[in-house]
Amino acid sequence: PRDIVTKLRHFATANGGTDAMKNEYLPSEDWVTPEELYACTTCSACVEQCPLFIDQMGKIIEMRRFLTMEGQLTGTAVRTLQKLGSHGNPWGFESGDRTPWAKENEVPVLGNGAGNNAEEFDVIFWTGCFGAYDPRGQEVASTISELLKEAGVKFAIMGPSETCTGDPARRLGEEALFQELAMTLSLIHI
């Protein structure tokens, strides 16, 4: 990310200062390549550690949006976005596969014997895609579930009705898909 910001500074200097950045969404590949933009994991560590308080991630995501609008996404990014759109998660797993870990740990699932009314519970535990599908994420979700049980908190998970928050789509630069997934969440009052 530091190199991208440095290249953006050089681009602005070579093209009349910061006003050049206002009119250009993305400098040509001579300045910043798509490979450089997608090499960033968008973990935000650079933003947290930057002594100059530069928002590198915001600039990178904005340039990714431009690439997406121009139809320049390829490979893994395209497949991930397709899976998000069709299956509601970045891996393309079926929604019914979100809960096997919960059954093993006796975690109540809304609409599956736990009742259909979210108001019956103190907490609706949002596991997210990682917590639902990834083995390491399932371990974390199981541990949190155990802590909630020990604390006497009445909780449930959404199970198959839970979908992705859309964060991977936003980070890849696909704002429209992010908005669509976010709208789905707002319809279920989250």
Name each region found by the language model.
Residues 2-188:
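Iron-sulfur-cluster electron-transfer modules
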